[in-house]
Amino acid sequence: MLRVLHRAASALVMATVIGLAPGVAFALAEPTSTPQAPIAAYKPRSNEILWDGYGVPHIYGVDAPSAFYGYGWAQARSHGDNILRLYGEARGKGAEYWGPDYEQTTVWLLTNGVPERAQQWYAQQSPDFRANLDAFAAGINAYAQQNPDDISPEVRQVLPVSGADVVAHAHRLMNFLYVASPGRTLGEGDPPDLADQGSNSWAVAPGKTANGNALLLQNPHLSWTTDYFTYYEAHLVTPDFEIYGATQIGLPVIRFAFNQRMGITNTVNGMVGATNYRLTLQDGGYLYDGQVRPFERRQASYRLRQADGSTVDKPLEIRSSVHGPVFERADGTAVAVRVAGLDRPGMLEQYFDMITAHSFDDYEAAMARMQVPTFNIVYADREGTINYSFNGVAPKRAEGDIAFWQGNVPGDSSRYLWTETHPLDDLPRVTNPPGGFVQNSNDPPWTPTWPVTYTPRDHPSYLAPQTPHSLRAQQSVRLMSENDDLTLERFMALQFSHRAVMADRTLPDLIPAALIDPDPEVQAAARLLAAWDREFTSDSRAALLFEEWARLFAGQNFAGQAAFATPWSLDKPVSTPYGVRDPKAAVDQLRTAIANTKRKYGAIDRPFGDASRMILNDVNVPGAAGYGNLGSFRVFTWSDPDENGIRTPVHGETWVAMIEFSTPVRAYGLMSYGNSRQPGTTHYSDQIERVSRADFRELLLRREQVEAAVQERTPFNFKP
């Protein structure tokens, strides 16, 4: 039973970041207590949740199950409706609960065996970790039982949830959204919220910092509107472990995590862990090695909710080939999907063991289990070790490069059927490189540090592409390689970089050509671009025009190479492409961009932040930062402008944390869209003004910090 006690909040000492322009020093508040606090975490003697002024739960448990229970209770309070909907979907009952809009997801999950496999995986958990999963689910149920009016009637039917539901949601998210997805298998392509995943990560060794302390950046970029990509900030403390950070809602472990000893972060990588096999149908079966094989067939069914609230049973025949489950595309072709890692139930426990490791050796032992199916993972600790791993369950393939395996692979020959996967040591990794840092911004794993320590020739060509690194990824390498003696303050300033690297690479050729064009409007635009500091700041008057020109020059996603004078090269991965191949064509594109900018925004010199707005509830503030493919390290992807030329973020910076492994640890960060989306919450729009100002708040780990900031206490008792 939980009860909630309210009291007036004490004054909260926040970190304040001052200034947006490059070169302006970032000033932080003094630490809230004297340095040299002991590394040992506070050891709770009772179970309670202390809520700070931003709705962050600081969960103190007398043991691990108690902390997991409190974590489930806190997530339900902050995101209960969305979590229950996600759990209902992962159960394979979305169509039954909510109707036709969920039918495709239901069929996708049932055909791939997700609900059934989740039950098996739940049974295969270690007893201790299964108890943690049960406790997390019990916390969700307890909150809903104690606060029934706070849960939407639409999702109450999902209750109660179980530890198996927790596993099912994680399994669906990792294996059947990140690794395999319905859009890729059905040939429709991923929707933007799934296709545009991204993140930034840095880890810096002590020798590259001013104070001799390692530094870590956590910075995922995902959709702001998609439930399963919504992040949640929390702090868990027991006598045996401490974890602070953020993770997607519904997950019982924190994936972007740190404590007084170490931390990790993740970025989406391009590992191809799923293969779509194109089948040749014949005589009711499929061709394989010159013979017709029958499909394995299994009869199943699901219920579909009707408009009047009734349900009808829908039969579902599940066909499988030797490769895996079979799906029919809209054009009538049959495709079988084979997903690596479906024999590995331990992803959640591996993450938990990674983020509670007592040494780098312990961390490596957890990583070597290879239960986490994808992601680049970056590590740093207070002893000074840093590591980058191109992690994932990667099939061993006899031939073909990554482009071949990303496509529709012939399914009529056993030569393409993979049955084994690579161990961790086969994958691109680097520990404590000479350059003193590791990084990843969703680029292929060939420049995780600078100078590089390995090349693509050291690895199979199907592991990762040798394709152009984005300008954001190039900027990531340069921001780290060109800065030494880093303080936490300077580290934070670099994270806020919103320089238009593409402008640096192209304007020296475009501007002179435009200045001699006879069109006065083109000349005026050239002068505007020449006066621009090439930063996506809120007061920039040329950024919108440049963005429109760059879309014509480099394509809709700003990733095209053909128009550059010098294209990208693996030999010069952080300084190419550059130059304008055809200045006359580029000037004509500028002429078109002038018209497009006027049509969309009313003028070519409208301030960037006047059009790019951060709007949540009744908060409406100017935005800064731009598209990663234009070179902005700090990323926001903007919606199409409305009739007033106003656009808002649809994707980009969500959680950001910058950590110094000092004694005690210092950390600052923000959750762009707040820490709750339940109806009536005050913690949805309460951080967006700080995002606009890059005004990072101190993240509170030490008990005395939390006590000084507490707004509400929730004592609880938990008995398994």
Swiss-Prot record:
Any one Gene Ontology cellular component term annotated for this protein = periplasmic space
* Reactions it catalyzes: (7R)-7-(4-carboxybutanamido)cephalosporanate + H2O = (7R)-7-aminocephalosporanate + glutarate
Q: Indicate yes or no for the key word Signal.
A: yes
Q: EC?
A: 3.5.1.93
Pro-sequence positions in this chain? 188-198
Report the enzyme's class at the first EC level: hydrolase
Keyword list, A-Z: Antibiotic resistance, Hydrolase, Periplasm, Signal, Zymogen
- Range of residues in the leader sequence: 1-29
Q: Which SUPFAM superfamilies match?
A: N-terminal nucleophile aminohydrolases (Ntn hydrolases) (SSF56235)
Q: Which GO terms describe its biological process?
A: antibiotic biosynthetic process; response to antibiotic
Which cysteines pair up through disulfides? They are: none
Q: Does Nuclease show up as a keyword for this record?
A: no
Give the Pfam families listed for this entry. Answer: Penicil_amidase
What is an example of a GO molecular function annotated in this UniProt entry?
glutaryl-7-aminocephalosporanic-acid acylase activity
Q: Where is the active site?
A: S199, H221, E653
Q: Where in or outside the cell is it found?
A: Periplasm
- What does this protein do, in the record's words? Catalyzes the deacylation of 7 beta-(4-carboxybutanamido)cephalosporanic acid (glutaryl-7-aminocephalosporanic acid or GL-7-ACA) to 7-aminocephalosporanic acid (7-ACA). Cannot efficiently use cephalosporin C (CPC), penicillin G, or ampicillin as substrates.
Family note: Belongs to the peptidase S45 family.
Instruction: Note the subunit structure.
Output: Heterodimer of a small subunit and a large subunit processed from the same precursor.
Name of this chain's protein: Glutaryl-7-aminocephalosporanic-acid acylase
Annotated source species = Brevundimonas diminuta
